[in-house]
């Protein structure tokens, strides 16, 4: 028991597993028709961070009316050695990129290839983070509409537990050869996306805004989405009550392998709470 005259203060809080269920399947939608032109692309890189790692391969296919009509494929000279683990994963080595164009020369060509098209990728946040960072460095405008086939798969293929490209391809009967090579992964993703378009039409949808309106925050989807560490602290009695509610929801309603707090629920019970990004497993990292 803390003495009443003590200056010791108890602060209620928790290190939580936060799920971003507010992010749509389509980013920066202009309410394009499902019959829009698409560029489905994939990157291979030297690592996971666009701040410190480099693009080593760009592969893309252009889709019009459900058919692949054009391709874009190139190695990119990263001007640094390719790490051994990346060489093992992609089979791309230094000798294959030594004579390739550098990103400053090839990225303008790629963005021109994408002009007027919706951009599509599997786990689009990763690939677009590299595209946007390099566009920023090179002062190239970059504000496309982006569709994430991972987010679509969570909604359209609810029976799957994992949504890696090879898993989704197998579920839909799509061939995937030379996995972790950009143009092959892009072609596979394009075939998957064309099938998803038909599934969306079967649900009566005709625009990308309607796709986003489906939402991603069902209990089943939250249970399959990635989690980020977060620190949540209560600043008052109301906050402590809301903290208890969130912890109860995380353990009773959304639990799957770990207790999960969706951002939508956090916003609902936001009063009296402070949130931080926690450790290296937090969203900011």
Where are these regions (language model features)?
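Early-domain small/polar-rich strand-loop-helix modules and first-structured segments
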Residues: 47, 58-59
